[in-house]
């Protein structure tokens, strides 16, 4: 088992587009310098041209080396998956610009079953999860362009999800309504999490509870407070399951219109009931759909979010403030994170880390999305010496230093359509 990561390292500040822009600028400089050695130029200012010609070979050599370095960096940027995605994106752009190709789909099918949903279902059946990720990301990003006859940016997951709602033919099902608080409870006292494995284990416990539950821990040293929130993933794949606020309908709404999704409303209700003030420090961990909710809560800016941990969540499209340390744990062959429609950003305080999960004979790629596999990955994260991984990990765990657990509350919810 080996980890692959990017982001979280302040020494790495260039994005792929910036690398390409730098390479283009070097090419312009190289062409400009070579153009300075026409015979007529020497007649105008022979001394200066001679001096330039003397130093030109070494300068051009340095430019060529820098171009080569940019090419190598761009070629190895992130992963092969990202490069393949770019190629598939070109294809989807072409189809979006030529909507008549949609006529190839059987009559009536396009208006009843959204392509994004078809792609999602198909992707989960692939044994090669990395192919599934590419399909999912590109389908969600381009779906709005397909159906609207406009070119898609490839990043428009929100529009893609909204089109799923608009065109699914089950409008009453893919609605949203605030879930009802069904009960408030407490769990036995426990110490603050001292590792990513321990934090992810508590997230797994939250997800495995019998009823849809948000768990909130309150820490204090007598002067300052910190709240730790655990958000479960999608618990029901049935959009008609109105008793479940963390179902597939809420997942689609969380992508398209997060503010009114049942799962986000449940999280906000729990925070309010727990007495979390706007100035109280808040660390949020979420699995799958819960990770998306965690990212959206951080992006809203209504609470003092000081840390975010997501596992198997589609969050690349969410604009989380740059000062918040974020750890996104994503398996290379897990299709779910790809439904963000874009890769997570390369940022100083956002690290994306994961591994490729072994898919055995008879299994689908969905095994890589299981919370148990993310628990194993969290254990590897604790052992990692990668600058980006260790830096963000230590920042997150440092939030609990000097604090003791005061109480743990559980908030059960029902409904939410």
Model-predicted segments: where are they?
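Intrinsically disordered, low-complexity segments enriched in Ser/Pro/Gly/Ala and basic residues
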Residues: 1, 287, 383-385
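N-terminal secretion-targeting helices of virulence/extracellular proteins
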Residues: 1-97, 417
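Generic marker of "main functional regions" within proteins
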Residues: 29, 36, 73, 87, ...
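Alpha/beta hydrolase fold serine-hydrolase catalytic domain that processes acyl esters and thioesters
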Residues: 48, 55, 101-280, 302-417
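Gly/Ala-rich beta-loop-alpha elbow adjacent to hydrolase catalytic centers
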Residues: 285-295
């Amino acid at each position: 088992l080996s980890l692959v990561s990017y982001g979280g390292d302040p020494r790495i500040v260039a994005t792929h587009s910036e690398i390409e822009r730098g390479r283009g600028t070097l090419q312009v400089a190289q062409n400009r310098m070579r153009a300075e050695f026409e015979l007529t130029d020497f007649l105008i200012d022979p001394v200066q041209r001679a001096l330039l010609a003397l130093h030109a070979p070494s300068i051009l050599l340095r430019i060529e080396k820098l171009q080569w370095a940019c090419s190598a960096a761009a070629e190895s940027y992130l992963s092969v998956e990202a490069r393949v995605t770019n190629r598939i994106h070109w294809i989807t752009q072409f189809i979006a610009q030529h909507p008549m190709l949609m006529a190839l789909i059987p009559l009536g099918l396009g208006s009843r079953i959204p392509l994004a949903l078809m792609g999602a279902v198909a992707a989960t059946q692939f044994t090669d999860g990395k192919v599934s990720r590419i399909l999912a990301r590109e389908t969600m990003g381009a779906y709005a362009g397909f159906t609207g006859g406009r070119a898609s940016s490839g990043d428009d997951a929100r529009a893609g999800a909204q089109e799923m709602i608009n065109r699914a033919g089950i409008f009453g099902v893919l609605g949203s309504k605030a879930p009802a608080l069904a009960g408030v409870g407490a769990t036995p006292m426990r110490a603050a999490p001292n590792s990513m494995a321990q934090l992810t284990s508590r997230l797994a416990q939250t997800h495995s509870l019998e009823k849809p539950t948000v768990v909130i821990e309150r820490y204090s040293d007598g002067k300052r407070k910190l709240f730790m929130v655990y958000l479960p993933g999608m618990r029901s794949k049935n959009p008609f399951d109105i008793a479940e606020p963390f179902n597939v309908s809420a997942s689609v709404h969380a992508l398209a219109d997060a503010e009114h999704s049942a799962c986000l409303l449940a999280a906000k209700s729990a925070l309010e009931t727990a007495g979390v003030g706007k100035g109280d420090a808040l660390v949020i961990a979420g699995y799958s759909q819960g990770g998306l909710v965690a990212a959206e809560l951080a992006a809203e800016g209504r609470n003092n979010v000081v840390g975010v941990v997501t596992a198997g969540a589609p969050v690349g499209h969410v604009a989380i403030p740059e000062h918040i340390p974020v750890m996104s744990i994503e398996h290379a062959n897990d299709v779910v994170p790809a439904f963000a429609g874009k890769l997570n950003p390369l940022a100083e305080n956002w690290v994306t880390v994961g591994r490729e999960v072994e898919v055995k004979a008879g299994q689908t790629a969905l095994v890589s999305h299981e919370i148990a596999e993310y628990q194993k990955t969290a254990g590897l994260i604790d052992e990692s010496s990668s600058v980006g991984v260790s830096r963000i990990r230590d920042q997150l765990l440092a939030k609990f230093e000097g604090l003791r657990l005061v109480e743990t509350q559980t908030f059960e919810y029902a409904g939410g359509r």
